């Protein structure tokens, strides 16, 4: 249970961190979409470990294989299966964690729920599970771009107390990818990199915020009342490992304003379209996209697995200490960027298909 996401564009991820591989089954992809591994590999490369000194040193190529659902370079409309094989697992690094629970990790709760857990690399709770999401998200991005010209760009907004100055209306993928921390503010990016590197040397971890903008989203996406667009976006990104908070538009800061200050006033643009002068709603009103840019923020906690000694307990309820071994991210933010983009793309693609299926039948 809990491994499937979406309605019409539906994905099921599978695999564990130290198993034979990880992947995804995608059901509901429209037929006749041009698709090859190269359409997917770019985003997987952005997500993969071992990219730089501020990520885990685990070395994986994360090479994807499409094993069903595509024929002669086009989707068939049948389930698409994508597999990425694990190549560099070092399970012996986790021997101590077979009995000791990592503080603030999923170890203890998985044990409590299932009565058994895969302690090698965290199993299903590992961020390696997100490979399937990113692969499926790459396909969703391609559909959104081809059908509606939607652009999705994520970036690191904040690391600990260091916050970048980024304009979501104009930021480009090239600017995001110009440095290893994926913060388009070049000056702040250098400070972020230094902070993460120092944290790594201290055997500790830090968190931060990823911001993501979806531009040119058509008006009308969202299914009130329980499947409002922002509700599905919140569920999507809050299902990512280490996520702890969600905001859209003005977010919590909007509570400091009055209605007259917060309302996005309407006007008619030169093309006769209804637009808003401001975008404090974040592109969604009443749970439905309004045609403005959708802007969300996701908070990620500091990585739970750290090399500093901490107090914990064993599966036999004995108090002990743990200084985790193995290879872990001192900060997940730079690798979380393509994960957030993927989840946003999956939600928007699913809602685009739902909108067309319901609202475009009778024109």
Curated annotation (Swiss-Prot):
One of its GO terms (molecular function) is chorismate synthase activity. The keyword Lyase applies. FMN binds at residues 124-126, 286, 301-305, 327. Its cofactor is FMNH2. Reduced FMN (FMNH(2)). Its EC number is 4.2.3.5. NADP(+) binds at residue 47. Pathway: Metabolic intermediate biosynthesis; chorismate biosynthesis; chorismate from D-erythrose 4-phosphate and phosphoenolpyruvate: step 7/7. Residues 36-58 are annotated as: Disordered. It catalyses: 5-O-(1-carboxyvinyl)-3-phosphoshikimate = chorismate + phosphate. Pfam families: Chorismate_synt (PF01264). Keywords: Amino-acid biosynthesis, Aromatic amino acid biosynthesis, FAD, Flavoprotein, FMN, Lyase, NADP. GO terms for biological process: amino acid biosynthetic process; aromatic amino acid family biosynthetic process; chorismate biosynthetic process. It is an enzyme of class 4 (lyase). GO terms for cellular component: cytosol. PROSITE patterns: CHORISMATE_SYNTHASE_1, CHORISMATE_SYNTHASE_2, CHORISMATE_SYNTHASE_3. This reaction introduces a second double bond into the aromatic ring system. PANTHER family: CHORISMATE SYNTHASE. Homotetramer. Belongs to the chorismate synthase family. This is Chorismate synthase.
């Amino acid at each position: 249970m809990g491994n499937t996401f979406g309605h019409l564009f539906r994905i099921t991820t599978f695999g564990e961190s130290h198993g034979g591989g990880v992947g995804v089954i995608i059901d509901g992809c429209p037929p006749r979409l041009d698709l090859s591994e190269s359409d997917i590999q770019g985003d997987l490369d952005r997500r993969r470990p071992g990219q730089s000194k501020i990520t885990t040193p685990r070395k994986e190529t994360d090479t994807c294989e499409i094993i069903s659902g595509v024929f002669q370079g086009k989707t068939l409309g049948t389930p698409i299966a994508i597999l990425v094989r694990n190549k560099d697992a070092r399970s012996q690094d986790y021997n101590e964690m077979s009995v000791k629970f990592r503080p603030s990790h999923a170890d203890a709760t998985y044990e409590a729920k299932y009565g058994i857990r895969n302690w090698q690399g965290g199993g299903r709770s590992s961020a390696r599970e997100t490979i399937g999401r990113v692969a499926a998200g790459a396909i969703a991005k391609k559909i959104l771009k081809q059908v509606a010209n939607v652009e999705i760009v994520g970036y690191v907004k904040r690391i600990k107390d260091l916050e970048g100055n980024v304009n979501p209306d104009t930021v480009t993928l090239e600017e995001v990818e110009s440095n290893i921390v994926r913060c388009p503010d070049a000056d702040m990016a250098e400070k972020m990199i230094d902070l993460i590197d120092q944290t790594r040397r201290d055997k500790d971890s830090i968190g931060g915020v990823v911001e993501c903008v979806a531009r040119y989203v058509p008006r009308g996406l969202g299914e009130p009342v329980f499947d409002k667009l922002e509700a599905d976006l919140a569920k999507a990104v809050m299902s990512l490992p280490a996520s702890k908070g969600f905001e859209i538009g003005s977010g919590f800061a909007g509570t400091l304003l009055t209605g007259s200050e917060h309302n996005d006033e309407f006007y008619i643009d030169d093309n006769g379209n209804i637009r808003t002068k401001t975008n404090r709603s974040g592109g969604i009103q009443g749970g439905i996209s309004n045609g403005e840019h959708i802007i969300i923020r996701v908070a990620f906690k500091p990585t739970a697995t750290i090399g500093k000694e901490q107090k914990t307990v064993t599966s036999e309820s004995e108090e002990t200490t743990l200084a985790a071994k193995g290879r872990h991210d001192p900060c997940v933010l730079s690798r979380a960027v393509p994960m957030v983009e993927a989840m946003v793309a999956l939600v928007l693609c699913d809602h685009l298909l739902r909108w067309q299926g319901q609202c475009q039948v009778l024109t």
